[in-house]
């Protein structure tokens, strides 16, 4: 389960991987390579150390001159701990943990607001909150008898927002699922409750 407190930086940023919607398929090899690159980049022994004593160069009059050492503040890229890198790798390499992490991350990005206008800012990001009963329900054509719910989006996609029984079962504990439109960048939060005897 993902902790409610978000890390200093998101796990995709730590491993220098793209966070896309819908989530891009990342192979175990891609994750492992990104993990090793992050470890090498942020390893304390590999980091460029600024010497405590300045480097000396000799001038023509044999006086010692001091070179300015590289400014560490010039590189504004964050440094991550080994623990942060390991947590990112473990979360993104486990399909269940990654799905939960992605859900939390998408929700945070969609509903993030600033100051007193937080709710208003969240509204402007395109998150619409609806009940499952507000969507059209039909049986999927996969022969398994599974149901799907959909609703058109203002971008013109008649099935822009689509959720399946399997999606709802995964989020049964939360009673809500956040989905993005298939045709644009709008989001919808669907509220639902599992009936007795379901799941």
From Swiss-Prot:
One of its GO terms (biological process) is protein histidyl modification to diphthamide. Residues 55-77 are annotated as: Disordered. It comes from Aspergillus fumigatus (strain ATCC MYA-4609 / CBS 101355 / FGSC A1100 / Af293) (Neosartorya fumigata). PANTHER family: DIPHTHAMIDE BIOSYNTHESIS PROTEIN 4, DPH3 HOMOLOG-RELATED. This is Diphthamide biosynthesis protein 4. The DPH-type metal-binding (MB) domain can bind either zinc or iron ions. GO terms for molecular function: metal ion binding. Zn(2+) binds at residues 153, 155, 181, 184. It is found in: Cytoplasm; Nucleus. CDD domains: DnaJ. The gene is dph4.
